[in-house]
């Protein structure tokens, strides 16, 4: 009866281990996806940073150009000055937009990093659970093997004792206690 009970436990442990393996694979897939999203967020933040830098350089170049025109000419028409001023304002607005895009990209990067970290923690937890159930299954397999081997040895001993007419070990032990 004990062997059958252990076999049921072994089968149950085996099913649980398989379930834990499926959960671990699922967590690994999710982790891979989150790490890819994190990588994309890093690239997006880098691109946004470059775009902001380019916009700042363009504005600085336009301001330098205006300053050179102002210093080279004694007089600059009001229309030309307004044109340069509008162009600089447009570049300033673009810098503001690029700065906001960079801020958003950094926030997205932090969120992706947090999500990847949480998913990694879940994967580690699931991996540990799978290892635990693998160990339990291995321990149960060894216990079943030991019990089967012991049962086989007892049967062999009983057969030998019966063959030589001495009775079984069970009968002998019962007689000793009477």
From Swiss-Prot:
It comes from the Bacteria. Keywords: Plasmid. This is Uncharacterized protein y4yJ. It comes from Sinorhizobium fredii (strain NBRC 101917 / NGR234).
């Amino acid at each position: 009866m004990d062997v059958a009970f252990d076999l049921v436990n072994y089968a149950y442990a085996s099913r649980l281990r398989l379930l834990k393996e499926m959960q671990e694979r699922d967590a690994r897939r999710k982790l891979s996806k989150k790490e890819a999203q994190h990588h994309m967020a890093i690239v997006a933040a880098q691109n946004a940073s470059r775009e902001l830098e380019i916009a700042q350089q363009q504005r600085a170049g336009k301001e330098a150009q205006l300053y050179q025109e102002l210093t080279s000419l004694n007089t600059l028409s009001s229309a030309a000055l307004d044109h340069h001023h509008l162009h600089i304002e447009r570049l300033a607005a673009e810098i503001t937009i690029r700065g906001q895009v960079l801020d958003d990209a950094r926030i997205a990067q932090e969120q992706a990093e947090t999500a990847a970290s949480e998913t990694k923690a879940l994967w580690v937890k699931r991996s540990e659970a799978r290892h635990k159930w693998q160990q339990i299954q291995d321990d149960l397999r060894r216990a079943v093997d030991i019990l089967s081997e012991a049962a086989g040895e007892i049967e062999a001993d009983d057969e030998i004792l019966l063959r030589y007419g001495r009775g079984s070990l069970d009968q002998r032990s019962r007689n000793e206690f009477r």
